[in-house]
Amino acid sequence: MKYIKTLLSLCCLCCGAAAAQTAAIAPTDPHIQYVGRICFQNPERPRFSYPGTQINVAFQGTTLRMKCKPGSGYFMAQIDDAEPFKVAFRGPRDSVVTLCTALPDARHTARLMYCIEGYEYKPEFWGFQTDGQLAEMDPLPAKKVEFIGNSITCGYGNEGRLGEPFRFETENHYYGYAQLTMRRLGAVASIVARSGIGAYRNYGAPKDGSPADNMPAQYEYTLYNDQTERWDFSRWQPDVVCINLGTNDLSTDNYDTALLKQGYKRLLAQVRKGNPKAKVVFLCGSMLGGKELDICKRILNEVTEEAHKAGDKLVYRFDFSPQTGDLGYGTDWHPSLRQHQRMADELTPFLRQLMKE
């Protein structure tokens, strides 16, 4: 009996030690660094919709696990300066993913970026688990940008191939032009983007537009298609706001150019109200061609010139080179990974100069 009691005591000690080895870190921990539009109405389960949402942390230890709502989708993860890799929360029970283990017991950093659109998955972050403790995270870059866009900005199908159906597994915003540009500039971006969305008319919508769910209808809220929380613009004041819309508005030859211009102007007014000191850049491309490309450029030039005449001199224009297929296509004729690299090659020097002015 004495032997059994001793054995049980040892087991309890071992179990206690094992439990102590992995500590649960709540999403409310002040060491966790967030980037993007995140809803903290339930601070223990923050929600987000848009690609590019970042969750960063530093820790002293050997192991780090991430906990999310099952079925939250895909993240790109980078531990220290190692090669980034994709992690998935796919199944109904996939709530914990090991990001790293058996590392040297030292300070490490983990950077997570949501790399798909969350309008179907409705992702939630539930915290971390570590055998050590959190440490102070590196500060965010000083240069801040906001990208407002459609599937091009999302990275729709950039890891896929022309002719195959779209799957979220082949969408990777991390390797899209926006994030490639940010890494080259040493800047950080918040993203408001959804495939199929327009400045006035979403893809395939009637000629009179999509007033309930186009970008002006969505821009002032934290989450996509969810009006429970208005976005607090004081949480993110970018130096530059890049707007890349128009491809869906001008789709299927069923558009109204006057309404498109109104949509751009309405969105510009919203952006300027929320970000009074930001430089705003209207981007065009890289999927449009022919007549629609000419229309998009003309309207954006008009909106920019009219803003200047009205006293807003901080509105700019930039055109990407139209894709030609020489770099291949992603799913549904969308930019390939190589096309996104070319777009970043073009946008990076423009934004670098703009941020110096």
Set out the residue ranges of the language-model regions.
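Short acidic/His/Gly/Ser-rich catalytic and metal-binding motifs that mark active-site loops
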Residues: C154-N158, Y200-N202, L250-T252, G325-Y329
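Proline-centered flexible-loop/turn and helix-kink motifs
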Residues: G71, P276-K277
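Extracellular serine-dependent O-acyl
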Residues: K279-C284, E292-G330, Q339-E357
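Conserved SGNH/GDSL esterase-like catalytic core that processes O-acyl groups on lipids
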Residues: G52, Y119, G163-Q262, L288-E302, ...
